[in-house]
């Protein structure tokens, strides 16, 4: 029986140190392993860092995309209905697309620009029809979309802008964080991404109703994580038993574990240095493959 082959180029390097290890140990010592106060503290820090009103942590970036799409069906005035068209780039990770298909939406693919690997703007504009209800923009491999142009395309139209920012945490467009240009944005903290929380994802929004819907859908559709006055059920009962077992929406269980929240608090402090190092790595590869006869590399926008 042969042992595992060690890769020449690892997928990612470890960015944890004593701070993350101490955070994990503190959770172990507390005896509270499921989603709790550390996750809540991370969500507050995450929202503050990226300039959003609300952040909801989940167990992966893929779960963030699923929850984000689901939430658009469960507001009082739904943003989406089955059969609506949603425009997406032709290049992304699979779980950008699968939630759209799972909710009965018509996925409209737009080809990407060969240099930036984001949606080619003239093709994006041409893809918009009266049936288009959302654009799900993906900031691929650190490159931001041209949100000025995209917002011009949808100005005056009933089209929702969403962002899959799982691969571009820390990128900005016009000094505004990517993930915050649309109604909602998703992030990933998988171990090879900009921050590593073992597994993890996050959604940001400034919309209070969507925030409440996300909280409900994230954990079984129950009401126990909602504030007393909320936009899903109105006013909650003061009876804790009643609210602990009241299910208002057809939810999932996408909760993160408490350790991931604790690690995220420490990783978020280091994010600027992580982004800086990744930019240096990107510049190195751009130089290395410049004018290569067989390899075309993504160009920074």
Where is each model-derived feature located?
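Phosphate-coordinating loops and pocket residues in cytosolic domains that bind phosphorylated ligands
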Residues: 102, 180, 216
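N-terminal "arm"/small-domain region of PLP-dependent enzymes with the aminotransferase-like
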Residues: 1-32, 37, 248
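Phosphate-binding glycine-rich loop
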Residues: 32, 36-85, 99-103, 109-111, ...
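Conserved active-site segment immediately N-terminal to the catalytic lysine
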Residues: 163-197, 212, 243-246
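PLP-dependent aminotransferase class I/II
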Residues: 39-44, 52-56, 61-62, 122, ...
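PLP-dependent aminotransferase-like
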Residues: 74-140, 144-165, 172
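Adenylate-forming
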Residues: 197-200, 262-264
